[in-house]
Amino acid sequence: MFPLPGKSSKTEDKSFPQKNTLQIDGRLICWDKPQLMGIVNLTPDSFFEGSRAGKSLDRVTELVASHISNGASILDLGGYSSRPGSAEVGLQEEIDRVIPAVKWIASNFSGSLISVDTFRSKVAEEAILAGAHMINDISAGDLDEEMIPTVAKLQVPYIAMHMRGNPQNMQEKTKYSDILGEILYYFAEKLEQLRKFGIKDVIIDPGFGFAKTLEQNYFLLRNLQRFETLSLPLLVGISRKSMISKVLKVNANEALNGTTALNMFALCQGANILRVHDVKEANETLKLYNTLYP
């Protein structure tokens, strides 16, 4: 049994900024309401075809313009599919997918906040130098020992997600004695590590679908409020995932209704950022949530 952080173990703003603020590109961004992160997959094999742009800058432009006009405040670009059992992608291939898109968006959509989804420090560094603003790491530094020092050097916001193993073997690592306690303990230790490196702008992601069974995913979602003990922004990424399609017996293309339902539940449980494929529908959900909780 792992100890659960209690109220006395909350991370106060002496170490990290207040929950609804982030330092981004020299600006203090204040978010009093939940935000939307629009997904742009620079891959040929991400599990939802509608999010794929590949290396086509025309398709990148189409997706980004749609996400921004529909209410996304962050764009999340990824060049390495992390779906269960996904194929390994070489470092240079990931760079070749990500960097041109970052430069294009930074040049043509000025003012947009660009997040890059990578667990590789080299990709992270090149992306920030190309115009990205934050790093979204599915391994929280566990797959590349240089990631955390690199983020510290770059002084950019860092999204730390919980996962065991890697995308190729993570679904073989789903045995927990106390999944909620173990994940909270993992983040408590991870935040201490980040603090020692001077990283202050941190967002946490429980990692739905990463080294978790269907039942474990729903258990974590039901208990999402427990992550409030960490006093940091909470990102939830459940959009069109198999935890929805398996229950509804549909494929990813048909999982929008289920995504919308669970996104509303996540907001009610304390989610601060929703990472989504369908920004328009997520924004409608957010408007209803903000009407319920003005």
Label for each model-derived stretch:
Residues 2-7, 13-17, 24-25, 31, ...:
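Active-site-adjacent loop and "lid" segments of alpha/beta metabolic enzymes
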Residues 31-38, 42, 66-78:
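N-terminal glycine-rich anion-binding loops that anchor highly charged ligand groups
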Residues 207:
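Conserved Motif II region of HX4D acyltransferases
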